[in-house]
Structure formats: structure tokens, C-alpha cells
Curated annotation (Swiss-Prot):
This is Ribonuclease P protein component 4. It catalyses: Endonucleolytic cleavage of RNA, removing 5'-extranucleotides from tRNA precursor. Its cofactor is Zn(2+). Its EC number is 3.1.26.5. One of its GO terms (molecular function) is zinc ion binding. PANTHER family: RIBONUCLEASE P PROTEIN SUBUNIT P21, RIBONUCLEASE P SUBUNIT P21. InterPro entries: RNP4, Rpr2/Snm1/Rpp21. It is found in: Cytoplasm. One of its GO terms (cellular component) is ribonuclease P complex. Binds 1 zinc ion per subunit. It comes from Methanosarcina barkeri (strain Fusaro / DSM 804). GO terms for biological process: tRNA 5'-leader removal. Consists of a catalytic RNA component and at least 4-5 protein subunits. Belongs to the eukaryotic/archaeal RNase P protein component 4 family.
């Protein structure tokens, strides 16, 4: 197989992996109200896909997963969102850890 064919195959595999991660994320959002354990499993599958293909999880998905206990974070249910000193502070109610994400202030 030539270099170009390998590159095209790798790009195709990564595109499929990203599609699957987004689909699992949507399923986790919809299933959380009735089956929170199922949404935890979907998060685990998202992590497995990203590790298997050696690629990062998209930022929108990554910000909804606890970095310590890998829980699916839902604002108001198991996560608390606060604005503090130019950061969005996300507190996981399951493990008690906090994640901080910077945001730009409007001038």
C-alpha cells in the first residue's frame, strides 16, 4: 500500500471515529435522565475509541466529562457550573473535583 493510500485510510478511520464519538455523546445526553449508568458506559466507549485510534476527544465532548472520575456531567444534576476570575469552574458532584476552563472577557 502506498503512502497516499495509507494516509487516506487513516483519515477515513479518524472521520468514522469522530462520527461515532459524536453519536455516543448524543446518546449519553438523551439517556442520562432515565439511565445514568448507560450514559457512563457511553462515555467509557468514547474514551476507548479515542485511545484505540490515538486521537483526542473533541473539546465540546471533553468538557462534559469529568477528568477525574469520567462521569458524564449534566449541569444541575451532577455538575455545578460557576464563573470565577475569567474561568468557568465545573465541579463534579460525584467525586468533588473541579475543572477550570478559561473564557474570554468582553471588552
Amino acid at each position: 500500500m502506498s503512502r497516499i493510500a495509507r494516509k487516506q485510510q487513516k483519515n477515513l478511520i479518524q472521520a468514522i471515529a469522530i462520527q461515532r464519538m459524536w453519536r455516543l455523546f448524543e446518546l449519553a445526553k438523551s439517556e442520562y435522565a432515565e439511565h445514568p449508568d448507560r450514559s457512563e458506559r457511553y462515555v467509557q466507549l468514547i474514551r476507548n475509541i479515542s485511545m484505540r485510534n490515538r486521537m483526542s476527544i473533541p473539546r465540546e465532548i471533553k468538557n462534559r466529562i469529568c477528568k477525574h472520575c469520567y462521569a458524564f456531567l449534566v449541569p444541575g444534576n451532577n455538575a455545578r457550573y460557576r464563573l470565577k476570575d475569567g474561568y468557568i469552574v465545573v465541579s463534579c458532584q460525584r467525586c468533588g473535583k473541579e475543572m477550570r476552563y478559561p473564557y474570554k472577557k468582553l471588552k
